[in-house]
Amino acid sequence: MKRFAAVSLAALMLLTVFASAASAADVIEIRGPVYNGSDINDIIDTYGENNALTIDATKFAAFYYDIDDNVTTETLSILAVPGTEGNVIGEGGIVYETTIQQVDYEFYRPAAGWSNYSLIGFFAEKYIPINPDKADKLAKLVLDSDDKYTIRTGEQLDLGEGYSIEAKQVDVDGEKVWLEFTKDGEFVDDEIISVVSGSDNTWEVELDDIQDEDDVVVLRVHVNQVFQGAVDSIAQIEGLWLIDYTNAMKIESDDEFGNLDNVKINGDTLTITNEDTFTLTRDDEEEIAEGLFFKTADDTRALRFYAMKQITEPGTYEIRGEVAEGDFSWDATNFAGFFYDVNDDVSTESLTVTGLNGGNVIPEGGLVYETTIQMVDYEYSKPSVGWDQFPVLGFFAEEYIPINADKADKLAKLVLDSDDKYTIRTGEQLDLGEGYAIEAKQVDVDGEKVWLEFTKDGEFVDDEIISVVSGSDNTWEVELDDIQDEDDVVVLRVHVNQVFQGAVDSIAQIEGIWLIDYANAMKIESDDEFGDLDNVKINGATLTITNEDTFTLTRDDEVEIGQGMFFKVADTAASDLRYYPFVEKTIDGEVVDDDEDDDNVTEPVDNDTEVEEPTEEPTEGPTEEPTEGPTTEEPTEEPTEADGTTPGFGVVLGLVGLLAVVYLVRRNN
């Protein structure tokens, strides 16, 4: 019996070691249109044409898109080739194609040589072809900016990916600046740039032997002004463009990209297809190539899927809807920002624009946001033990739970809905996110019960003893009163899978957690305003918000709709209109900085005024991807490690426990 206990403890310890050693990063999923049909051929017939279903950047927010120039480069197609049937795509039936296009510099000054450049999207990333008309040699675009940056002599401007420029000196007349370009602190090139009348003020760095190509422009810098002051010498830069030439790549015909392995290069066009069949496995994510996936629903009655891109790098990302040119309507199938449950095929939100009549002004009541409560399955779906469904409401692209299942007026954000397994020792806390945690206080001597405690910001909320003996449902529901004047509100559900009382440790295994942020629950009133949406109507399970005043889609601007949702409008002629809705999602964390020596690095801030003697240190510099701006608090999809504690065993403690088990076994022998 002792040997059995020791072996059982060892198994659970091993599970815990691996659970605590692996840390799940936050992930943003950018999805394409949702396709739903009886099988793949039905979907191609319904959504495609000429035996082909094609997705481009106007529909798939992950693909590169320039709204001002209306430029796309990438398409992903599914073809009705032989072998395409059921949920299987035949050989050559997946076609990824991208073609070089010309786009304007952000710093658009054609008279000064800043007009346009060649760009190609490559698996939802922006690349620059080394040869403007050949798609075989590519370097990632690091920076394309028209912001103004002011740097003192001796200071560096961090451009990202380890690249930087430094203002070495300014001449005594304040007409020239000596700039130096470095990579990972190593000298690359330098130049003296003049800003006197008649100069183009632009420095182009050309390098040789970039994938066997010479005279490759890797950096462009436009110096706006130079100032020689009594205290400081400074240069103002407006216009930066940079490629990651050190990691340039050459694409060969025998290269493979995930499940796409048949590569064809025809001048400015790159085409990659699948040589083998591709199965859309239900309830799974199948990688197409380079971080692009097909996500397929867990539904045996139909085939439902979408293409998507997974992002894990820290930063703030724009998630857009389908591009419109007039009156239009978006829901979760064509706006990736809206809540969508692919398994249950459930969406709740819609956004509609009517009454434009060829102009860019939406009349009163012409902008309508509507959302309706729907039922979805728990991630831990076990109807036999009470884990079947719960009500959900998308609210401005966030997932909320109605306090009353059939009323859309009182909402709390969903923090967690998980079917992952977590193993915690007595005395340890499991961080659930947003300041919520549960702790295993004690396990009974028979290993059949566990005492759990629920806290918020370290303060006691509730506790319970959960039994796992046969016949118990093993689920703890925390019900609280006075949540927006409602009583008996379920705020937490926890399913305890196993309890173990060992010779070394007492542990509990949890599988199934559901939590709402009840502490920040809100009530929506009819006189509330959400940005420019200020006419609120609540009709049972449906919430409708419209505009009481006219709403102008200002060209070359981002216009807030409400609650962090915007329209981005293209810089077009007055006779044209092009726009899309978007939200921003943020992955927290520090962006990796290749330059570890920060003592002499200043990241300048934008400066829209004439250069004067600076009184403060500039504080910010350009990055490839925006890291500031409106951030969206996202529900935590998985519990994370609390500060100072680890859910489950740490690796070291786990190993110590294993050694103890070995000792017990040897002693009993």
Swiss-Prot record:
Post-translational modification: Glycosylated.
Entry-listed glycosylation sites: 36, 70, 116, 600, 607
Gene Ontology cellular component list: extracellular region; plasma membrane; S-layer
Domain of life assignment: Archaea
Name of the protein in its database record: Major S-layer protein
Compositionally skewed regions (Acidic residues) per UniProt: 590-627
Compartments (UniProt record): Secreted, Cell wall, S-layer; Cell membrane
UniProt xrefs under Gene3D superfamilies: 2.60.40.4190, 2.60.98.40
Family the entry assigns: Belongs to the Methanosarcinales S-layer protein family.
Transmembrane segments: 645-665
Example GO BP: cell wall organization
Function: S-layer protein. The S-layer is a paracrystalline mono-layered assembly of proteins which coat the surface of the cell.
Signal peptide residues on this chain, from the entry's feature table: 1-24
Segments of this protein annotated with the region Disordered: 588-648
Keywords of the record: Cell membrane, Cell wall, Cell wall biogenesis/degradation, Glycoprotein, Membrane, S-layer, Secreted, Signal, Transmembrane, Transmembrane helix
A Pfam family: PGF-CTERM
